[in-house]
């Protein structure tokens, strides 16, 4: 099976998890469940990458700020 989508989790810039899946719906479902800064001290970054190389990023900060790109 080829893994074409990935969801990565970084806490304070350190990679803590990578999920690789072959279908878009599973990847999007996992990415939408990322809703806070988790166990990070300052911020958590979640990236969703698709087969074309496009990356969607959202970052949650301890102060409540959320940045999506």
Walk through the language-model features, giving the residues of each.
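A short, charged, amphipathic alpha-helix used as a generic interaction element across diverse proteins
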Residues: 9, 20-43
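Short aromatic-glycine-(Arg/Gly/Cys) micro-motifs in beta-strand/loop hairpins
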Residues: 1-16
């Amino acid at each position: 099976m080829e893994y074409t989508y990935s969801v990565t989790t970084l806490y304070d810039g350190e990679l803590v998890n990578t999920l690789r899946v072959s279908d878009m719906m599973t990847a999007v479902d996992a990415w939408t469940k990322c809703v806070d800064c988790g166990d990070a001290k300052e911020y958590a970054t979640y990236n969703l990458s698709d087969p074309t190389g496009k990356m969607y990023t959202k970052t949650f900060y301890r102060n409540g700020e959320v940045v999506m790109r």
